[in-house]
């Protein structure tokens, strides 16, 4: 299994259990998330509760919770939305911090294509949700989520150059 960690913080953000598609010249990875239900496990042990005097409301009060699989699996923490100025400020800092961690070839590729990816994200800014890794480190990468037209499940966007592949 492969896990993808934030290159700046070491937080686990993704794994190969969630296939990705490269967009914006490979700078962004697009990953489909899904809403899943956790809790409220209904175990059928073969007993007939009505014959035993039991009702539907008997037993443990177990609450089902809907979560997004990627957010739950990697314990992503949602952040307040950014306005355009805040986003541009974040991107400048992120580009500077990430570029310092990349080798020369990756750095050149990143700097060549990051402007297009930034414009792509700016075009979706009002529709994006922002997430950081579990450590909630300020200088780490962001994970973006949005809903495509008519979709009920979110699509996540990752900066590919900001991820480090780790074999587990």
UniProtKB/Swiss-Prot annotation:
Record flagged with keyword Cytoplasm: yes
Cellular compartments annotated: Cytoplasm
PANTHER family in UniProt: TRANSLATIONALLY CONTROLLED TUMOR PROTEIN-RELATED (PTHR11991), TRANSLATIONALLY-CONTROLLED TUMOR PROTEIN (PTHR11991:SF0)
Keyword tags: Calcium, Cytoplasm
Record protein name field: Translationally-controlled tumor protein homolog
Family designation: Belongs to the TCTP family.
Lineage: Eukaryota, Viridiplantae, Streptophyta, Embryophyta, Tracheophyta
Residues annotated as domain TCTP: 1-168
Domain of life assignment: Eukaryota
Role: Involved in calcium binding and microtubule stabilization.
């Amino acid at each position: 299994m492969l896990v993808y960690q934030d290159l700046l913080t070491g937080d686990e953000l993704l794994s190969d259990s969630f296939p990705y598609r490269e967009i914006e010249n490979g700078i962004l990875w697009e990953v489909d998330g899904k809403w899943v239900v956790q809790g409220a496990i209904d175990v059928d042990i073969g007993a007939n509760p009505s014959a035993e005097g039991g009702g539907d409301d008997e037993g443990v009060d177990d609450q089902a919770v809907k979560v997004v699989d990627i957010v739950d699996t990697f314990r992503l923490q949602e952040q307040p939305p950014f306005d355009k100025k805040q986003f541009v400020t974040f991107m400048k800092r992120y580009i500077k911090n990430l570029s310092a961690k990349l080798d020369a070839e990756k750095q050149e590729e990143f700097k060549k294509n990051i402007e297009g990816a930034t414009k792509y994200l700016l075009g979706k800014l009002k529709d994006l949700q922002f997430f950081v890794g579990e450590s909630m480190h300020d200088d780490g990468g962001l994970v973006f989520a949005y809903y495509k037209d008519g979709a009920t499940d979110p699509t996540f966007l990752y900066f590919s150059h900001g991820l480090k592949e780790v074999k587990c």
